[in-house]
């Protein structure tokens, strides 16, 4: 039997939600009621699969952790008042911390004037952000297209590369095994995880995947394309594979890929959605090798953890294919004033506080500690790796990684696995994480592993 729409029910639900938004604190009964509501609504109206996935971030496997508010720049508080050190960072969103006052203030000030653009008049903040990114990014990157997410920035990059290379008779893209570029149809064609790809096959034609970090395989793909007349339009890759398990390529890999692109007339697209904005110890990870892409994809931390925004930045030569018809690829909300205000404030904070350098220093402290723990618990931990504040602890199997996330939750530290590598736990805290909190995270990790070791010995 079809359910009839109910305006009264919708009005009551929205009014209840608005009442919650206005509240700063909840009493015990309100907390319990909200937990029950959220769990029920996820089950009935969002996706029940998320509940099973999030069992690792509950104390008793009862989905009890419902997010309520930021505690500080580096912590989250749930509805029960429990404060967690954030070592997940919203998968790389909170580089400048939670509710950074500079970013929040910029958005609030813009909100008081004009939240969204008219679509017809020229919007000043979009122009100013584009100019700022042209100054900030490496090489000849000059023009920016703004959108709302990482996968949208990748879609724009792929379309831009197609528009530039199709008249030159080049149609094929090279991506890499283990890659994650998003889940919209074009981005998914470059992504390399079968569990995400298979239900939507066939995907876009013209994508080849070669092993990440293997320059010989990359070179062979270029050569074969040349021999068969199926020439390469562009290479798309992450400087460090985030969802693949924080996989670092050999030193010099990006430099060699750049040389191949130049030799064969292909574009180099770097997806820095997760590695960008200071995360790895440089503003952009490609700067570790002084590599300059033709197209750069940004999102996640660009909005300062306050607003969603993505950007696709390209050289004038490439971007000029859109000059004659700027409406070839557009988006209603991309580059809106609130998002641009957040991005401009985020860049200001990153530079003023020199957060990329802090990420390098504090990342070294954390990684040294994790590697020491790996040496102490070789039966549990296979590897600890990373760059800056993008790190991973790889466990011996999926179940051990899941157990570590649960134990860290009990220690009030929030971590999670990666989408393409289940036995790898990602450590991706705000770049503002203090040295004291770094030490607390390492202490919690030691306690978690010690508890896991006891369980192993008791079996």
Swiss-Prot record:
Residues reported in the UniProt entry to bind pyridoxal 5'-phosphate: 150-151, 274, 332
SS bonds (residue pairs): none
Family membership noted in the UniProt record: Belongs to the class-III pyridoxal-phosphate-dependent aminotransferase family. Putrescine aminotransferase subfamily.
Protein's recorded name: Putrescine aminotransferase
Residues bearing the modification N6-(pyridoxal phosphate)lysine: 300
Listed InterPro entries: Aminotrans_3, Aminotrans_3_PPA_site, Class-III_PLP-dep_AT, Putrescine_aminotransferase, PyrdxlP-dep_Trfase, PyrdxlP-dep_Trfase_major, PyrdxlP-dep_Trfase_small
Statement: the UniProt record of this protein carries the keyword Kinase: no
Cofactor(s) listed: pyridoxal 5'-phosphate
Catalyses which reaction(s): an alkane-alpha,omega-diamine + 2-oxoglutarate = an omega-aminoaldehyde + L-glutamate; putrescine + 2-oxoglutarate = 1-pyrroline + L-glutamate + H2O; cadaverine + 2-oxoglutarate = 5-aminopentanal + L-glutamate
Domain of life: Bacteria
GO molecular function, one term: putrescine--2-oxoglutarate transaminase activity
UniProt keyword Nucleus present: no
Record function comment: Catalyzes the aminotransferase reaction from putrescine to 2-oxoglutarate, leading to glutamate and 4-aminobutanal, which spontaneously cyclizes to form 1-pyrroline. This is the first step in one of two pathways for putrescine degradation, where putrescine is converted into 4-aminobutanoate (gamma-aminobutyrate or GABA) via 4-aminobutanal. Also functions as a cadaverine transaminase in a a L-lysine degradation pathway to succinate that proceeds via cadaverine, glutarate and L-2-hydroxyglutarate.
GO annotation (BP), single: L-lysine catabolic process
Species of the source: Salmonella paratyphi C (strain RKS4594)
The protein's Enzyme Commission number: 2.6.1.82, 2.6.1.29
Alphabetic keyword roster: Aminotransferase, Pyridoxal phosphate, Transferase
Name of the encoding gene: patA
HAMAP family cross-referenced by the UniProt entry: Putres_aminotrans_3 (MF_01276)
Pfam family, one: Aminotran_3
Pathway: Amine and polyamine degradation; putrescine degradation; 4-aminobutanal from putrescine (transaminase route): step 1/1
